[in-house]
């Protein structure tokens, strides 16, 4: 066994060892001075493909393709926010299993990874927010917290250890199936779009639509920890960014979210647009969503910043 592999195993067992901390200091630049794993190549290749398709999109423009972009962005984006984030990561509401799985599958098509991977990373983010162990810590720079952290799986292991915080998802066959077959679903989507509308639908759907949604999601990790307003006393740098709320389906009320992590509602004021909450509320009204969590008045008073 090589010395390198021995060190990596020590990182995985104890991400707080001096060797692991020193490794974190050395590995800010994710494209060199490091060992690339197969998962890193897969994620980088997927990202490169999505952005390349987006750059090709102007050459294949049609009005119908523009509608495909809107549908892809909306279905995938709401899948991420309603399913991966509020339902699976924070358990802020419950729905029947058939609906839970359907929403998760919509999120999978946003090309942001499988539920187990996404939810685990997000739970670690809340556990270690803005610290050295935050998977996408803003302390390591805007571009790292925005996108570059995705391409270094070993660095994530050195920070947080193995994905031991998603046993609730690992116990379910559906999420294990998606984790093992995610690439086939994305490829299938590509062939389906090509069958319906050729390269026009592929470039505008999986290119423009997916790229926009990826960067809006990433702005929550980067921009919403750097710029914006604060309403609540949280032990982090989370911010509310009002102009991003429509595009993020309500996710950019990020200081609200970090103050009340388990809340299904993130736009806590009537004027704070939160499309994801409107979807959850609709499910609740028609009897599909139960145990919907929102902060109490006492909790809001306790967390409010006195001005």
Swiss-Prot record:
Fe cation 1 binds at residues 85, 90, 122, 126, 257. A motif (Histidine box-3) lies at residues 254-258. The chain crosses the membrane at residues 53-73, 99-119, 182-202, 204-224. Its cofactor is Fe cation. The keyword Lipid biosynthesis applies. Residues 1-17 have a biased composition (Polar residues). This is Delta-9 acyl-lipid desaturase 2. Belongs to the fatty acid desaturase type 1 family. It comes from Arabidopsis thaliana. Keywords: Endoplasmic reticulum, Fatty acid biosynthesis, Fatty acid metabolism, Iron, Lipid biosynthesis, Lipid metabolism, Membrane, Metal-binding, Oxidoreductase, Stress response, Transmembrane, Transmembrane helix. Substrate specificity shifts from delta-9 to delta-7 desaturation when the protein is retargeted to the chloroplast. Residues 1-21 are annotated as: Disordered. Pathway: Lipid metabolism; polyunsaturated fatty acid biosynthesis. Its EC number is 1.14.19.75. The histidine box domains may contain the active site and/or be involved in metal ion binding. Coiled coil: none annotated.
């Amino acid at each position: 066994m090589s010395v390198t592999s021995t060190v990596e195993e020590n990182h995985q067992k104890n991400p707080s060892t001096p060797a692991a901390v020193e490794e974190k200091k050395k590995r800010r630049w994710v494209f060199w001075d490091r060992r690339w794993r197969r998962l890193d190549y897969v994620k980088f290749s997927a990202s490169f493909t999505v952005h390349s398709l987006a750059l090709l999109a102007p050459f294949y423009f049609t009005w119908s393709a523009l509608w495909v972009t809107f549908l892809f962005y909306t279905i995938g984006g709401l899948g991420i926010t309603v399913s991966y984030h509020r339902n699976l990561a924070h358990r802020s509401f419950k729905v029947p299993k058939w609906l839970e799985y359907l929403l998760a599958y919509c999120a999978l098509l946003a090309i942001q990874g499988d539920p187990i991977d996404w939810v685990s990373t997000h739970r670690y983010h809340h556990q270690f927010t803005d610290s050295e162990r935050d998977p996408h810590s803003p302390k390591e720079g805007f571009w790292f917290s925005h996108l570059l952290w995705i391409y270094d799986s070993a660095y994530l292991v050195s920070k947080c250890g193995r994905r031991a915080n998603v046993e609730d998802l690992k116990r379910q066959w559906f999420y294990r199936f998606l984790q093992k077959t995610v690439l086939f679903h994305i490829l299938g989507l590509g062939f389906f779009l090509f069958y319906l509308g050729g390269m026009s639908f592929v470039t505008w759907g999986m290119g423009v639509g997916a790229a926009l949604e990826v960067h809006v999601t990433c702005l929550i990790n980067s921009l919403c920890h750097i710029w914006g307003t604060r309403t609540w006393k949280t032990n982090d740098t989370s911010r509310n960014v009002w102009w991003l709320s429509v595009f993020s389906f309500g996710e950019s009320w990020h200081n609200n979210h970090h103050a009340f992590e388990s809340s299904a509602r993130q736009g806590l004021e009537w004027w704070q647009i939160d499309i994801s909450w409107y979807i959850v509320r609709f499910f609740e009204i028609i009897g599909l969503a139960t145990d919907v969590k929102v902060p109490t008045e006492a909790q809001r008073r306790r967390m409010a910043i006195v001005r």
